[in-house]
Amino acid sequence: MEPIGFDRTEGAPLSGEDIESLLRNLTRPVLGQRDEALDDFRISIAGAQEKTALLRVDGQWMRPLGATPTTHIFKLPLGLVANLRFDLSDSVENEWLCSRLLAALGLPVAQTDMARFGDQRVLVVERFDRRRVSEGRWIARLPQEDFCQATGMPAERKYERDGGPGMNDILRILAAGSHPMEDGLVFALSQFAF
């Protein structure tokens, strides 16, 4: 059965104030209140950082409707972490700068921009797992697999110190890909950069 609406782009336009409210409510939910306009809008993006995702069409931010996927991830500052011992309030600026440094080294990075919606500061990241198809009429999701999935490891073992995949495992998988030399070089350069 073919999904309904996959072959078109549909979204509800959002103003800057709408986005500010959406971002504010990510970190400060009010008991008993909800934004009914967003009730059908649910996303799941891994990671510890507060984030959401939206659709951008011809310069207009939108809430995707139906089968239309998001195109950009909005990441809020981390703030105080580790029982208030570390202040990562500048995480938006830090991640933006790191992406510029990695790009300068020749590594492929997602397009990032810093943006402000009212008093909400965010890093806007263009999703690398999306492609416009059919002359831009709709957006295709590109399935992704991380190295835990590729090696059959459970998510709780995502770090090498916990028994997750290490450099040798990753290089072995990359060697079996369609661009083994290029992928291996990018991986090695990224290890050097970090």
PLM feature spans:
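Phosphate/dinucleotide-binding and metal-coordinating scaffold of catalytic cores
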Residues: 1-194
